[in-house]
């Protein structure tokens, strides 16, 4: 029998659209953009299963719930990938690479893959705790998902030998992604628009700096010509007298 540990009191500690099963199970399932798969995952033996749409606050909430339960050692990514957010790929990048000093998920391709409320320590705990990420992205086949859960259960290494890691996210268990002061989920179309707006903003900033340089260069050129004419007239005046 694999060793088990008590999860954080009141686990799951962060609210969400998940279904909860046996907290001693070693498997967590993220159904990404798909709904209706959760109960089947729980029936197959998962500790927690639910969708995740956003590559920032959504991922933060999943990480918070996983690392507050030391028993969860496998993450299964299944269901339809979220267009624009590309949440499944962002999860994989987070597990494989971690985050940078700016909170950005290294190697993530989503529109806004930045974690503002989860620090490096928490991310490294997540990476240590999860021994395998099973990639079933874009798979909604209950049979295949159930088989993956069973395979993970058969390889249960036991709980990580660390206490539950508790993250205090804004809104806590009583709040959601719509709470004031918290990043709000956006549609894939809006994510793409925001990404393009950032690119446009950067281009405008560059063009502004270029315009300032050109204006300075032009003004300097005019001043140089005026100074040259003044000196020429001065010299001619001296020579004439």
Curated annotation (Swiss-Prot):
Pathway: One-carbon metabolism; methanogenesis from CO(2); methyl-coenzyme M from 5,10-methylene-5,6,7,8-tetrahydromethanopterin: step 2/2. GO terms for biological process: methanogenesis, from carbon dioxide; methylation; one-carbon metabolic process. The keyword Signal does not apply. InterPro entries: MeTrfase_MtrA/MtxA, MtrA. Its main location: membrane. It is an enzyme of class 7 (translocase). GO terms for molecular function: cobalt ion binding; tetrahydromethanopterin S-methyltransferase activity. Coiled coil: none annotated. The keyword NAD does not apply. Residues 1-220 are cytoplasmic. It comes from the Archaea. 5-hydroxybenzimidazolylcob(I)amide binds at residue 85. Keywords: Cell membrane, Cobalt, Membrane, Methanogenesis, Methyltransferase, One-carbon metabolism, Transferase, Translocase, Transmembrane, Transmembrane helix. It holds the Pfam family MtrA. One of its GO terms (cellular component) is plasma membrane. It is a single-pass membrane protein. It catalyses: 5-methyl-5,6,7,8-tetrahydromethanopterin + coenzyme M + 2 Na(+)(in) = 5,6,7,8-tetrahydromethanopterin + methyl-coenzyme M + 2 Na(+)(out). Its EC number is 7.2.1.4. Binds 1 5-hydroxybenzimidazolylcobamide group. The complex is composed of 8 subunits; MtrA, MtrB, MtrC, MtrD, MtrE, MtrF, MtrG and MtrH. Part of a complex that catalyzes the formation of methyl-coenzyme M and tetrahydromethanopterin from coenzyme M and methyl-tetrahydromethanopterin. This is an energy-conserving, sodium-ion translocating step. Belongs to the MtrA family. This is Tetrahydromethanopterin S-methyltransferase subunit A. It comes from Methanocaldococcus jannaschii (strain ATCC 43067 / DSM 2661 / JAL-1 / JCM 10045 / NBRC 100440).
């Amino acid at each position: 029998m694999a060793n088990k540990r008590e999860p954080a009191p009141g686990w799951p500690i962060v609210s969400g659209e998940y279904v909860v099963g046996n907290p001693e199970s070693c498997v967590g399932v993220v159904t990404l953009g798909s709904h209706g798969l959760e109960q089947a995952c729980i029936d197959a033996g998962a500790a927690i299963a639910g969708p995740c749409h956003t590559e920032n606050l959504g991922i933060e909430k999943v990480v918070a719930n996983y690392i507050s339960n030391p028993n969860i050692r496998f993450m299964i990514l299944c269901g339809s990938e979220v267009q624009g957010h590309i949440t499944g790929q962002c999860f994989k990048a987070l597990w494989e690479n971690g985050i940078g000093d700016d909170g950005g998920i290294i190697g993530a391709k989503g529109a806004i893959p930045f974690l503002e409320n989860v620090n490096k320590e928490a991310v490294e705990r997540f990476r240590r705790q999860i021994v395998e990420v099973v990639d079933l992205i874009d798979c909604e086949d209950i049979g295949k998902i159930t088989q993956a859960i069973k395979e993970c259960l058969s390889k249960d290494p036991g709980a990580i030998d660390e206490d539950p890691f508790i993250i205090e996210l804004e809104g806590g268990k009583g709040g959601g992604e719509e709470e004031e002061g918290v990043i709000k989920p956006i549609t894939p179309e809006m994510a793409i628009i925001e990404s393009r707006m950032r690119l446009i903003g950067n281009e405008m900033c560059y063009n502004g700096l270029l315009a300032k340089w050109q204006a300075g260069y032009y003004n300097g050129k005019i001043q140089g010509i005026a100074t040259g004419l003044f000196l020429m007239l001065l010299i001619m005046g001296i020579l004439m007298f």
